[in-house]
């Protein structure tokens, strides 16, 4: 499961962006992943603070952005995949928000086909 999360996050351009630590995908190894898994298993895992940065928007305002460490991103992805595997089958077929392969466009298509 961790290898699947690693593979998914590795493809993302943001994988090389450090959070509060200088940790990026380059520093990840099987040994490091095993340490993270052991910390979670024995309830010693601690989330690290998120690095906050402000990105300028076109209208001149700033957009706040939180950048977690790479280890935190990986643990979040594992949790997301576990929760998704459990809850996705229980969702209504007519529900489109925040679901894999669904969104506002699929909702509009369904409305157009039904009505």
Language model features with spans:
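Conserved pre-catalytic core of RNA-dependent polymerases
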Residues: 1-115
């Amino acid at each position: 499961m961790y290898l699947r999360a690693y593979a998914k996050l590795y493809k993302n351009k943001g994988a090389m962006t450090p959070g509060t630590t200088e940790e990026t995908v380059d520093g990840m190894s099987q040994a490091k992943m095993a340490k993270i898994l052991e910390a979670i298993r024995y309830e010693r895992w601690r989330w690290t603070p998120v690095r906050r940065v402000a990105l300028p928007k076109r209208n001149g305002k700033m957009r706040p952005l939180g950048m977690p460490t790479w280890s935190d991103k990986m643990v979040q992805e594992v949790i997301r995949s576990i929760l998704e595997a459990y809850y996705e089958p229980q969702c209504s077929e007519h529900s489109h928000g925040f679901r894999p392969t669904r969104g506002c466009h699929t909702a509009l298509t369904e409305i157009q086909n039904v009505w």
